[in-house]
């Protein structure tokens, strides 16, 4: 984890969980920027590398980092460390931000913040030592949510139908789901000493979350949703008509069709429809990532 010396001097010190409540109180003192203020500061930093402009951009978004970091508290790491890593991602986002592209800084920086936090969690869990694949990362950061959606809170093995559902949802193999679930149930590296569940009660972090609206949060979420929707529409054009139709009917419809129904439409087996669905989903994800990368919406990976 980076030390506080890598952060701008105006960022409050964050030494450990004991000071976390003080830190969250301190960052609420920084004013929220209006769109025109944010634009002018971003232009000043972009054109003149003005450190004061950069500091104001960073400090006005520290609450965003804290809120995102709170969402990762179920991985057994101190929230203070997650926030510190997120702050580093925020500063990278500020450095790369182009105000002329029409997005608010929060919409752009959220990619960098999440990437920085996730990479830190992965390093801490030593998944990289296993040769972390894109599928493993996807599973690691979505498995708890999907299990929660199907009320599968137990730490034991998943039921076969639960494995099938998660594998199909994420476009990975059943074996990868089973292996990742077992690894996460064991708590990763024993040195992490994980003591909290995602549905646990009485944790200090639970009452430290800022309940006030987060700097035009609704507007920012709408902007991000619009960006993702545009990327999805463009990425769908990379699929052929059959792939597009099957993927839409299986994953993007309010009333998804069954494999049997689609197998009758195309005169192929249910397994063939499933294969086309998985392949189309994989192509769609890659297309979205390529489009996002071309538009500089993603951090550059080392």
UniProtKB/Swiss-Prot annotation:
InterPro entries: RNA_pol_sigma-70_dom, RNA_pol_sigma70, RNA_pol_sigma70_r1_2, RNA_pol_sigma70_r2, RNA_pol_sigma70_r4, RNA_pol_sigma_r2, RNA_pol_sigma_r3/r4-like, RNA_pol_sigma_RpoH_proteobac. CDD domains: Sigma70_r4 (cd06171). The keyword Ion transport does not apply. Residues 259-278 bind DNA. GO terms for cellular component: cytoplasm. It holds the Pfam family Sigma70_r2. It comes from the Bacteria. Interacts with the RNA polymerase core enzyme. This is RNA polymerase sigma factor RpoH.
């Amino acid at each position: 984890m980076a030390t506080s010396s890598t952060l701008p001097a105006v960022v409050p010190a964050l030494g450990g969980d004991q000071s976390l409540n003080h830190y969250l109180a301190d960052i609420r003192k920084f004013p929220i920027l209006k769109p025109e203020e944010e634009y002018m500061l971003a232009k000043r930093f972009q054109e003149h590398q003005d450190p004061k402009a950069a500091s104001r951009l960073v400090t006005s978004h520290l609450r965003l980092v804290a809120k995102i970091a709170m969402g990762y508290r179920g991985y057994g790491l101190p929230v203070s460390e997650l926030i510190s890593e997120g702050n580093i991602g925020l500063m990278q986002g500020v450095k790369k931000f182009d105000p002329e592209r029409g997005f608010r800084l929060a919409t752009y920086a959220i990619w960098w913040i999440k990437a920085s936090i996730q990479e830190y969690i992965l390093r801490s869990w030593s998944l990289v030592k296993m040769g972390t694949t894109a599928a493993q990362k996807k599973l690691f950061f979505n498995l708890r949510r999907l299990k929660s959606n199907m009320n599968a809170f137990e730490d034991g093995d998943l039921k076969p139908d639960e494995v099938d559902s998660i594998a199909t949802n994420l476009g990975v193999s059943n074996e990868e789901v089973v292996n990742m679930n077992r690894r996460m149930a064991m708590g990763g590296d024993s040195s992490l000493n994980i003591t909290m569940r995602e549905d646990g009660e009485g944790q200090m972090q639970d009452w430290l979350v800022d309940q006030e609206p987060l700097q035009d949060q609704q507007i920012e979420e709408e902007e991000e949703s619009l960006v993702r929707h545009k990327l999805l529409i463009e990425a769908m054009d990379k699929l052929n008509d059959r792939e597009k139709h099957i993927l839409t009917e299986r994953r993007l419809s309010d009333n998804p069709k069954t494999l049997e129904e689609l197998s009758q439409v195309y005169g192929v087996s249910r397994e063939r429809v499933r294969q086309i669905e998985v392949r189309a989903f994989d192509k769609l994800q890659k297309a979205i990532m390529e489009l996002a990368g071309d538009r500089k919406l993603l951090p550059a990976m080392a």
